[in-house]
Amino acid sequence: MSFNLRGAVLANVSGNSQDQLQETIVDAIQSGEEKMLPGLGVLFEVIWKNADENEKHEMLETLEQGLKK
């Protein structure tokens, strides 16, 4: 049996408001649970696929700076 994690995550948050999405992200990060990481990855994939080149560059700069801390 195969489980489509990406599809499950997207189905779970599809139609959510910005506030609901923020709550989902904050809860996942604050919980610190490893099992939440794939879901955050799926959400990041959506952000990345919908970002223009300037937004991608800004995200990469933010990531690079965050990893230097």
UniProtKB/Swiss-Prot annotation:
It comes from the Bacteria. Keywords: Sporulation. It is found in: Spore core. Its main location: other. Induction: Expressed only in the forespore compartment of sporulating cells. One of its GO terms (biological process) is sporulation resulting in formation of a cellular spore. NCBIfam families: SASP_sspI. This is Small, acid-soluble spore protein I. It comes from Bacillus cereus (strain ATCC 14579 / DSM 31 / CCUG 7414 / JCM 2152 / NBRC 15305 / NCIMB 9373 / NCTC 2599 / NRRL B-3711). The lineage of its organism: Bacteria, Bacillati, Bacillota, Bacilli, Bacillales.
